[in-house]
Amino acid sequence: MVKWKIVFTKQSLKDAKLISAAGLRQRAEKILAVLEKNPFQNPPPYEKLIGDLYGAYSRRINIQHRVICQIYDDLKIVKIIRMWTHYE
């Protein structure tokens, strides 16, 4: 099985600090591990986003926060856009 490469935006790296401070690091790491193996694995469930984030996918960390990513299937890359709320 091919491992997917995870890349982070500057914003997602800032969000990682907030996630850690909020005590959600372990949950976020589980989601990142799933994305590294197979970003289309279900569960945990994911949603395709619309609007400003059209083409991106969302996975729930908790009721408020999400991991938002873009998936480049041909390159086997998962780009993490946000790891905090995307409702702001």
Regions found by a protein language model. Name each.
Residues 2-18, 22-30, 50, 59-66, ...:
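Enriched for short, Lys/Arg-rich terminal
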Residues 33-59:
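A short, surface-exposed loop/turn module that caps and links secondary-structure elements
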